[in-house]
């Protein structure tokens, strides 16, 4: 991943049998360091690093993990513009919940929503998806042990490191399925943090894990990094984390969203090596499966989209999510879909491709009595 450590920036010190190195303070103070780089979003391109996707059940964590895998394998934007993946490279995606048949559906859905076929050649070469729930040998990172600590790295870790050497990114979804220990055990959590960092160091890859959110945060809407279920040591050890949450009833009402079940809010809960670029309006919108003019099925897939902002005042335009938006001259226009909703090359072509396709089956009459033209 990153270049070998510059010898001068650290100096070996004598600490009996421990391999410790002291930072060269003079060099650090007087010489400009190389610029930071990222694998995807703000996940640092550094050995010994892991990040987290945190969210409740059904918050599309696995979908986002797949989008990230495709983006890094092909050097593309995540989900049509969520974050960049500046350089392509090999991705190994271990999925513990979704069988091969389901992953087939999802990859096919992603393919139908891509305008540029070049991604397929890249992913065919760079993306390994391993559906562990489909009868493969499982993957366990830590397990009970007779040793004093009570836990040890599972032999699977050595096999994972051997297989993933040279990869750019390793995704583990979900983390809880790969740990044979209580999530609340701090001793097991400390070993898990060390194991994830070790996997990154030994393979040269960044590591990204998905993990469930705790019940208190699901009820309160807390989006912080520490809302991950179980011991706080695991999210504390991550250098980047993203929280996914469904819309609350109040948020949907305040924003005049009539199809909240299609939306997932995206929040950057932690970015240790960068300023966080959070927006309260950033989300994934899950477009349902539809059929094009030729009778071809276009799979449902979540893509990046901005949540509508309800503007104050009786004369202010009031966008109706998924159905109607208002242009600068007050004329009603069809909302952009997917890639064209936010940014990215090919946005116009994407919107043109879907211009005549049906929208989600949601209310077609506005609260003020105006008929929706769609």
Model regions: which residues?
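Phosphate-binding/switch region of NTP-binding enzymes
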Residues: 52-53, 58, 62-63, 169, ...
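Conserved inter-motif catalytic segment of the P-loop NTP-binding fold
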Residues: 18-20, 86-183, 374
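Hydrophobic alpha-helical membrane-association signature
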Residues: 68, 156, 188-192
């Amino acid at each position: 991943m990153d270049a070998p450590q510059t010898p001068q920036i650290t100096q070996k010190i004598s600490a009996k049998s421990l391999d410790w190195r002291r930072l060269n303070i003079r060099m650090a103070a007087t010489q400009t360091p190389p610029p930071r780089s990222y694998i995807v979003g703000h996940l640092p391109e550094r050995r010994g690093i892991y990040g987290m996707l945190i969210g409740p059940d059904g918050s599309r964590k696995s979908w986002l993990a797949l989008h990230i895998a495709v983006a890094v394998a092909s050097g593309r934007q995540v989900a049509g513009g969520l974050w960049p993946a500046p350089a392509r490279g090999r991705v190994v995606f271990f999925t513990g919940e979704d069988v091969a048949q389901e992953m087939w559906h999802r990859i096919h859905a992603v393919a139908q929503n891509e305008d540029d076929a070049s991604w397929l050649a890249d992913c065919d070469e760079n993306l390994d998806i391993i559906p562990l729930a489909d009868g493969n040998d499982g993957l366990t990172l830590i397990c009970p042990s007779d040793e004093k600590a009570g836990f040890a790295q599972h032999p699977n870790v050595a096999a994972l490191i051997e297989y993933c050497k040279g990869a750019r990114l390793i995704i583990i979804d979900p983390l809880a399925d790969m740990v044979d220990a209580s999530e609340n055990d701090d001793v097991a959590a400390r070993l898990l943090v060390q194991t994830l960092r070790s996997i990154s160091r030994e393979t040269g890859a960044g590591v990204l894990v998905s993990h469930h959110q705790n019940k208190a945060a699901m009820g309160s809407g807390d989006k912080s990094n520490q809302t991950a279920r179980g011991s706080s040591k695991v999210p504390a050890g991550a250098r980047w984390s993203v929280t996914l949450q469904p819309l609350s009833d109040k948020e949907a009402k305040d924003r005049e969203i009539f199809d909240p079940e299609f939306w997932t809010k995206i929040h950057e809960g932690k970015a240790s090596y960068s300023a966080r670029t959070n927006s309260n309006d950033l989300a994934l919108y899950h477009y349902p499966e539809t059929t094009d003019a030729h009778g071809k099925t276009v799979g449902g897939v979540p893509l990046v989209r901005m949540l509508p902002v309800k503007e104050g005042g009786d004369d202010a335009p009031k966008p109706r999510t998924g159905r109607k938006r208002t242009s600068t001259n007050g004329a009603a226009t069809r909302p952009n879909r997917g890639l064209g909703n936010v940014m990215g090359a090919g946005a116009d072509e994407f919107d043109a491709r879907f211009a005549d396709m049906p929208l989600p089956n949601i209310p077609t009459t506005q609260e003020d009595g105006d008929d929706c033209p769609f």
